[in-house]
Amino acid sequence: MGMIISMAMTAVTIWTKTKPGRVSCFIRKNSTMVNAPIGIIGGSGLYQMEALKNVEEVTLDTPFGAPSDSFIVGELAGVRVAFLARHGRGHHLLPSEIPFRANIHGMKQLGVKYLISASAVGSLQAEAKPLDMVVPDQFIDRTRQRISTFFGEGIVAHIGFGNPICPQLAQCLSTAIAGLELEGVTLHDRGTYVSMEGPAFSTIAESNLYRSWGGTVIGMTNLPEAKLAREAEIAYATLALVTDYDCWHPDHDHVTVEMVIGNLQKNAVNAQQVILETVKQLAANPFESIAHRALQYAVLTPPDKFPAATYEKLSLLLGKYYPPAP
């Protein structure tokens, strides 16, 4: 990462307020014009890629505070992409401390339409072995201490979340994995991701409970991330990298940090290849996702009842349907 940072150009986005009549809104000033249609959230190892060119570091502020870190923006296969270290460089944020709203808002600022979440997970099923890759299609939310919406404070919205993963983006990931024929890696192209609070790993009783619910993998980060991405009208899919069998399997050791890191390092190059191939697919065949219009009918509060301060915070999300009054 040191070499990338030394080569990076710094771009700072400053948010200032203007009042176009009915409400205030945020505008960006004095910033490098960055538009990256594809975003990747994961570990810092993901953007240490030889294929990543024209790299710059973009520091953003948001109405929801600072993101986990600066965004690393560059070109993969000629396409602008934005990477973000979910836990910050140096992995200094607990899962419960991740500024999920700021991270997703930052991706929205950068013009991201497709967001890939690369995540370490434990397996809850024997067939999903360590080093395998899972592309889930469902979530179970077991988090307790996290704000899971941009809305509130006078503006009410209810997004549809029955199918929480964008099926087209998930298919791109699955096709990329299958086409690479990675040695020792089996693709599981559907499954249920159980998102727990952490930071402690599961008890045996909890692990077996999640298995009885049909859980495929377990992790600590994809919720509320996926919900917020849907509210921001960003297509979202998960590349789940299996590192362990949690603690339920009688023939395997219980999960440890050492085990997780060891298997993640083994899978880092594979994950980079999958991301590169997925970016190529998206560049060749961009698509409109149901996520891209998730807010169209989701807001219940009449626009003339929007509190000015709340609209100001949400203008990047709401402006498409509720532009500021002239």
Swiss-Prot record:
InterPro entries xref list: MTAP (IPR010044), Nucleoside_phosphorylase_d (IPR000845), Nucleoside_phosphorylase_sf (IPR035994)
GO cellular component: cytosol
Site positions per UniProt: Important for substrate specificity: S202, V257
Binding site for substrate: M220, D244, Y245, D246
Domain of life the protein comes from: Bacteria
Keyword Cell division annotated: no
Pfam family, one: PNP_UDP_1
Any one of the GO BP annotations: L-methionine salvage from methylthioadenosine
Keywords: Glycosyltransferase, Purine salvage, Transferase
Annotated pathway: Amino-acid biosynthesis; L-methionine biosynthesis via salvage pathway; S-methyl-5-thio-alpha-D-ribose 1-phosphate from S-methyl-5'-thioadenosine (phosphorylase route): step 1/1
Catalysed transformations (reactions): S-methyl-5'-thioadenosine + phosphate = 5-(methylsulfanyl)-alpha-D-ribose 1-phosphate + adenine
Its EC number(s): 2.4.2.28
Example of a GO MF term: S-methyl-5-thioadenosine phosphorylase activity
Family: Belongs to the PNP/MTAP phosphorylase family. MTAP subfamily.
Chain's role: Catalyzes the reversible phosphorylation of S-methyl-5'-thioadenosine (MTA) to adenine and 5-methylthioribose-1-phosphate. Involved in the breakdown of MTA, a major by-product of polyamine biosynthesis. Responsible for the first step in the methionine salvage pathway after MTA has been generated from S-adenosylmethionine. Has broad substrate specificity with 6-aminopurine nucleosides as preferred substrates.
Protein name, as recorded: S-methyl-5'-thioadenosine phosphorylase
